[in-house]
């Protein structure tokens, strides 16, 4: 119901919502901006100001002064978004990636911690006193949100995941390199190895069954062609968006319909 949608998003009464729908009362700029943000469409395109040869992307990370806190805030926004789209039975989420996705490793505490340690080390950000993997302690809230994100991603009705053969190779190469630099102990390597095997068993199970533990559908594919980055899209009955991965945990996002169609087509071709 459009009126109910406006009432919920704009916090207005039913009669006020119907007056806006009938054109009797114009939307304020603030109301229009709020609708754009919630429904993921471009206000520039609505009013005809958008240049047809330019696209707008939003970078997930802009500040690195408090990286773990920033990452936790982004996780909370992602959880809220996935919770919203998971309520739509038509929602489709797809990823083509050359690295193991958070949709799987996020529920494994040590794998998740190693991914964040690698990211902090590569960008030379975070606490300079944290010199080794063992010294990195993740806040309990961040660990909880990582697992919560996995839960809500797997709550989407249909998921497509496409990997190339470098997924595990990237993790093994990083483990080997950090071990040689004495940034991680042999015992931690064994713990991470065990979690990698557990995750592989989980992936094999869902691949055979074609569904997560909650019964939602998942289709896993292996690409014979190397994937140069990570690409994903989400589509529901109301909106759509894409994400292009960069800098390990960062990404460029846009709800642009042309880019959505391009990324969706590209991902679909990788599953052939």
Question: At which residue positions do the language-model features occur?
Answer:
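Exposed alpha-helical structural elements
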Residues: 5, 16, 66, 70, ...
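Charged/polar, solvent-exposed surface patches and flexible loops
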Residues: 4, 8, 19, 37, ...
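Glycine-rich loops and low-complexity Gly/Arg-rich segments
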Residues: 44, 82-84, 259-260
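Hydrophobic protein-protein interaction segments
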Residues: 117-272
């Amino acid at each position: 119901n459009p009126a109910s949608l406006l009432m919920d998003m704009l916090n207005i009464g039913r009669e006020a919502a119907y007056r806006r729908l009938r054109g009797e009362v114009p939307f304020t700029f603030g109301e229009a901006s709020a609708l754009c943000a919630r429904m993921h469409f471009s206000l520039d395109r609505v009013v005809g100001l958008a240049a047809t040869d330019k696209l707008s992307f939003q970078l997930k990370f802009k500040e690195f002064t408090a990286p773990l806190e920033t990452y936790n805030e982004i996780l909370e926004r992602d959880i809220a978004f996935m919770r919203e789209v998971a309520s739509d039975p038509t929602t489709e989420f797809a990823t083509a990636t050359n690295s193991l996705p958070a949709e799987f490793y996020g529920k494994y505490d040590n794998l998740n911690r190693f991914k964040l340690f690698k990211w902090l080390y590569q960008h030379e950000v975070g606490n300079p006193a944290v010199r080794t993997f063992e010294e990195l302690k993740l806040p309990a809230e961040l660990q909880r949100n990582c697992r919560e994100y996995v839960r809500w991603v797997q709550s989407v009705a249909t998921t497509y995941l496409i990997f190339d053969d470098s997924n595990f190779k990237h993790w093994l190469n990083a483990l080997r390199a950090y071990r040689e630099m004495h940034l991680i102990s042999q015992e931690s390597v064994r713990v991470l190895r065990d979690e990698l095997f557990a995750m592989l068993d989980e992936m094999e199970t869902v691949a055979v069954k074609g569904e997560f533990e909650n019964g939602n559908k998942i289709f896993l594919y292996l690409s014979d062609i190397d994937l140069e980055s990570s690409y994903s899209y989400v589509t529901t009955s109301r909106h759509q968006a894409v994400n292009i991965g960069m800098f390990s945990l960062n990404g460029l996002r846009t709800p642009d319909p042309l880019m959505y169609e391009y990324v969706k087509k590209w991902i679909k071709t990788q599953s052939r």
